[in-house]
Design a protein with these regions (language model features):
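Aromatic-anchored helix/helix-loop segment that forms the rim or "lid"
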Residues: 85-127, 133
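Active-site gating/metal-coordination segments in enzymes
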Residues: 1-48, 55, 100-104
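Conserved, mostly hydrophobic/aromatic
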Residues: 10, 35, 69, 99, ...
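Histidine/acidic-residue-rich catalytic or RNA/ligand-binding cores of hydrolases
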Residues: 54-58, 76-82, 109-119, 139-155, ...
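Short, well-ordered coil/turn segments that N-cap beta-strands
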Residues: 5-8, 36-41, 61-64, 93-97, ...
Length: 183
């Protein structure tokens, strides 16, 4: 499957009841060393399992880990949603961990341009840098249009330089995953 174009790694969501215990019951224990050995990156919806990410990142320093959805729990917004942000920011000390800003608009109680979460995004950017902060949409559950999901990052975050925008909006994830999209 890794020889198929665009197939680069695993993504685990742990959102279905049978999967909910996998991160803590040993089910996933074999994945980490094998993924590291084979150079397969792993993306995680780790909002309820953030405490497991640091030990994995430390034990398997060559395993690329991407925390999806900013490490947030769905259904919460603003300060309530970002209450555990310090725990996620602490992961920046591991160069093999990156953050995907998937679904960012949904974590704001406001409307476009979702100003109530800009400071949180800025903290993530300041901590992880543009090389390890990746844009994403999860468009099917966004409170805005596709264009607004894009322009929130490309036009509404003044602290992103043009070079940073290029990284956050796609170049950085390609670099992080060694994903050659030139073909």
């Amino acid at each position: 499957w890794l020889n198929q174009p665009g197939m680069l790694g695993f993504r685990f969501s742990f959102t279905q009841p049978p999967q909910a215990t996998w991160p803590t019951d040993g089910t996933m224990d074999w994945i980490w060393p094998e993924a590291e050995r084979l150079g397969i990156p792993v993306a995680l919806m780790a909002s309820n399992y953030m405490s497991m990410v640091a030990p994995i990142a430390e034990r398997y320093p060559n395993l690329k880990l991407i925390v999806d959805h900013l490490g947030r729990v769905g259904g919460k917004t603003d300060a309530e949603c970002f209450a555990t942000l310090p725990e996620m920011l602490a992961l920046a000390k591991f160069p093999n961990v990156a953050i995907k800003a998937t679904g960012a608009p949904s974590y704001s109680s406001g409307s476009y341009p979702f100003n109530s979460i800009h400071d949180y995004l800025h903290q993530i950017y300041d901590t992880f840098g543009p090389e390890r902060m990746f844009w994403g949409t999860d468009i099917t559950r966004m409170p805005c249009s596709w264009k607004q999901c894009v322009t929130m990052f490309t036009e509404e975050l003044p602290w992103l330089s043009e070079a940073d925008k290029g990284l956050v909006m796609g170049k950085a994830v390609c670099n992080f995953l060694a994903w050659d999209i030139s073909e």
